[in-house]
């Protein structure tokens, strides 16, 4: 086990290159199961979730080669077999294997998914979609069993706007007989990315990126080459870090339209931002940041994944800010850790109330989930003294080469192995 140390107070300068989108990659890789020949995915981030998916595809018989961000998958030899809880449990997005395997093999057995613990993140909308397409879904001994004689297109209305359910139903429907219509579909850029891959493989999909997606089932899908979109959440995290400690930071390989809600809020705080087609320039040196209120919403609203890093930045603002998370109410475990660093904030229901400016001090803190880890990294960059962050298994699931990228910008960041005594203290905490 390791900890990440950050000696705070260094100004950030330079260029950071953004990796491929994690939330896209974890759906694109299962989608390759649906093809009958080789699929090449370019620009994948080097994170633990991708390595787990690579191993899972190999377990069901796929030939998978992954290096330097390029994954080549030959799905032809794959067979339908139960996927055990072990690896599946490490991965929230393992549920995409359900839609892909159901689509190709008409059956699947998947251990219940793991990932970050963010309160109720049920998969009932996924199951509703699979059942509408003609599958029988049962939960037996902690695994989901899916079986279908054949899949037939259907009209499916999602009761809750869900990225996971929208993508999973798309995966199951592209090879189904007839037309599928997904109503109240999610509109995230990652959904458009998955639809682009499936279309390149021969699927017939219209309306991805709107709230109604129409799919005409086809007989088979073939291989192709696909380049992933940049990670808007990684880009947003670096933008927030640059707003907190930046002099001049260029965010490279980014689609600014994917981050309009964040750009608007940072400008409201007084941060200077310049955009071009694939880059965002953050210009620092603001004497004072203004407080803002923000509410997370489904895309194109403010992303729940950037709510936590944003709370760190708001400790610098001169006044009171209110952050409300309408997506995941349990996403405030980072508040106690920030208070340990000297932040003045409290949680009331689904909102965090932050009073600033509150200078942060380095402390020993623990990341409870992926984006809480990002929030503590931003706080560590701002704090006086050294911050020690544990729970790095969460950070490594979502941020590719984090220390290298921060070091290149001028931060003082390094990893250390935990001592036996520190491991014992962690396990008892």
Swiss-Prot record:
Enzyme Commission number, as recorded: 2.5.1.7
Keyword set, alphabetical order: Cell cycle, Cell division, Cell shape, Cell wall biogenesis/degradation, Cytoplasm, Peptidoglycan synthesis, Pyruvate, Transferase
One GO CC annotation: cytoplasm
Active site, UniProt feature: 116 (proton donor)
Entries under Gene3D superfamilies matching the protein: Enolpyruvate transferase domain (3.65.10.10)
Keyword Transmembrane: no
Molecular function via GO: UDP-N-acetylglucosamine 1-carboxyvinyltransferase activity
Family matches, as CDD domains: UdpNAET
UniProt pathway annotation: Cell wall biogenesis; peptidoglycan biosynthesis
Reaction(s) catalysed (UniProt annotation): phosphoenolpyruvate + UDP-N-acetyl-alpha-D-glucosamine = UDP-N-acetyl-3-O-(1-carboxyvinyl)-alpha-D-glucosamine + phosphate
Entry's Gene Ontology BP terms: cell division; cell wall organization; peptidoglycan biosynthetic process; regulation of cell shape; UDP-N-acetylgalactosamine biosynthetic process
Highest taxon, organism lineage: Bacteria
Binding site for phosphoenolpyruvate: 22-23
Compartments it resides in: Cytoplasm
2-(S-cysteinyl)pyruvic acid O-phosphothioketal sites (modified residues): 116
Binding site for UDP-N-acetyl-alpha-D-glucosamine: 92, 121-125, 305, 327
Family: Belongs to the EPSP synthase family. MurA subfamily.
PANTHER family given in the database record: UDP-N-ACETYLGLUCOSAMINE 1-CARBOXYVINYLTRANSFERASE, UDP-N-ACETYLGLUCOSAMINE 1-CARBOXYVINYLTRANSFERASE 2
Function: Cell wall formation. Adds enolpyruvyl to UDP-N-acetylglucosamine.
Annotated HAMAP family: MurA
Identification of the protein by name: UDP-N-acetylglucosamine 1-carboxyvinyltransferase 2
High-level lineage: Bacteria, Bacillati, Bacillota, Bacilli, Bacillales
């Amino acid at each position: 086990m390791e900890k990440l140390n950050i000696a705070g107070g260094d100004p950030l300068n330079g260029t950071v290159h953004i990796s491929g989108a994690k939330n896209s990659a974890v759906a694109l890789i299962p989608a390759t199961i649906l093809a009958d020949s080789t699929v090449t995915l370019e620009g994948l981030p080097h994170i633990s979730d991708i390595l787990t998916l690579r191993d899972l595809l190999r377990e069901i018989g796929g030939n998978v080669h992954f290096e330097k961000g390029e994954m080549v998958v030959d799905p032809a030899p794959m067979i339908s077999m139960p996927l055990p809880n072990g690896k599946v449990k490490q991965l929230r997005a393992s549920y995409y294997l359900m839609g892909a395997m159901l689509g190709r093999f008409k059956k699947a057995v998947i251990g219940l998914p793991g990932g970050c613990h963010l309160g109720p993140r049920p998969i009932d909308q996924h199951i509703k979609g699979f059942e509408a397409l003609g599958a029988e879904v049962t939960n037996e001994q902690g695994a989901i069993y899916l079986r279908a004689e054949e899949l037939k297109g259907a009209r499916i209305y999602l009761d809750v706007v869900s990225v996971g359910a929208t993508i999973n139903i798309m995966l199951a429907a592209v090879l189904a007989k007839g037309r599928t219509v997904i109503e109240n579909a999610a509109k995230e850029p990652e959904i458009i990315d998955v639809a682009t891959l499936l279309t390149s493989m021969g699927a017939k999909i219209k309306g991805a990126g709107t709230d109604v997606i129409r799919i005409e089932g086809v007989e088979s899908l073939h291989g192709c080459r696909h380049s992933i979109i940049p990670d808007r959440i990684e880009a947003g995290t670096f933008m927030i870090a640059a707003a907190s400690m930046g002099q001049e930071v260029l965010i490279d390989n980014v689609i600014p339209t994917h981050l309009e809600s964040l750009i608007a809020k940072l400008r409201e705080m007084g941060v200077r931002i310049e955009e071009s087609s694939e880059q965002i320039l953050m210009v620092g040196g603001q004497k004072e940041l203004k407080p803002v209120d923000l509410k997370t919403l489904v895309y194109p609203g403010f992303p729940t994944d950037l709510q936590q890093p944003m709370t760190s930045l708001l400790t610098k603002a001169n006044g009171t800010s209110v952050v409300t998370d309408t997506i995941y109410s349990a996403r405030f475990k980072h508040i106690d850790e920030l208070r340990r660093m000297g932040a003045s904030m409290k949680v009331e229901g689904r909102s965090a109330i932050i009073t600033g400016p509150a200078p942060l001090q380095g402390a020993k803190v623990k990341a409870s989930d992926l984006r809480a880890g990002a929030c503590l990294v931003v706080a560590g960059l701002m704090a006086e003294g050294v911050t020690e962050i544990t729970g790095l298994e969460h950070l490594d699931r979502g941020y590719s080469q984090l220390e290298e990228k921060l070091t290149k910008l001028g931060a003082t960041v390094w990893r250390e192995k935990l001592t036996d005594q520190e491991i014992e203290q962690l396990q008892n905490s």
